[in-house]
Amino acid sequence: MPFLKAFKRTLKCTSATLLLSGTLLSPASADAISTDQATALIAALTDQLVVPAYTELAEESSQLVEVLDSYCAAPNTGDRSKVETQFHSTMDAWQRAQIIQFGPIYENKGPARIQFWPDKRGTGQRQLRQVLNNQDETVLPSGALAEKSVALGDLQALEYVLYNDPELTTQPDSFACHYALAIARNQEVHAADIVQMWVGADSYRDQVLNAADGTDVFFDEKEAASRFLNDMAGAIDVIRLQKIDRPMGLTITGARPKRTENWRSGRSLRNIQLNLESVQHFLAVEDGFGDVLSDIGKETTSQAAQQLISEILGHLAAFDQPMSKLVANPDARGDLESLLTKLRSLQSLVREQLAQDLGLVPGFNATDGD
């Protein structure tokens, strides 16, 4: 598998160097969990969360193709609500899987191929407008979008086509509708490829589950467990920094509602909820982080994390406006600041206390430097 060869030298040599230099773990924390516990942990997270999440994404993406194919055959008389419902189901599946920031997702252009966001320079929107304005049919043939900019074939592009000017997809023989279908087909193929890389021949799953023996990807089982821990912490950082703090701005006058994720389809809060539920599942699944913490006498850490996640989810459920309106609402500012404080506490709890209790070391993530 190409990505295994690409990662082999860097990951194994870096891990070995850090371990030998004593910079990864102190002697007291290095043995916090046993080889068997770490192996059971990574197996549980892989088989109960990661593989099912990508399988769901592949299934929903395939269903999206079917719904759009049927609708685009006669968009002027079709039921657009079915398209929107399936778009949301597909995006739900992606938001559940979004926490996973390693492995096959980084094969061929990375997570941006599924969702190019945030688009900080507006590059994607400019490309999309050009395609739609020119009715550029080079995006329509099978496989064409896989060779073009990720911003033209991802779920953000699909949201733009469906929601920026909905009337475009309702016209007979609509270019916009055909383009939406091409995007859906692009996502269907990509999601199926990811599942195949996780569970097919010479699979990434095998590389994870056999980490204790040393594989092309992981030096040992604790490096693999640390990778999962890092994704928990990274997901919390993305929520805090990119999905809430960035659109809020430093002051109410600096708020930028259109920086909220998926503001056109009104699902910014839903995305955050699903991301947090994935973090929660990493703790709550059988043989997951929560069970391991209990096994080593650190159940108070697990309980504190789960309690804080429940509080944050309750906080989100109390909002009665979309995030795009909340960030520009002076009356909501205090509630959003309180939410950010809770997320900072959760991030510290996971990255510091939970990691210390387990003897694991989370590394860098996508938000470092933001």
Q: Which stretches of residues belong to each language-model region?
A:
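C-terminal segment of classical bacterial N-terminal signal peptides
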Residues: L20-S29
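Bacterial N-terminal signal peptides that target proteins for export
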Residues: P2-A16
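Mature extracytoplasmic or organellar-lumen-exposed domains after removal of signal/transit peptides
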Residues: A32-D370
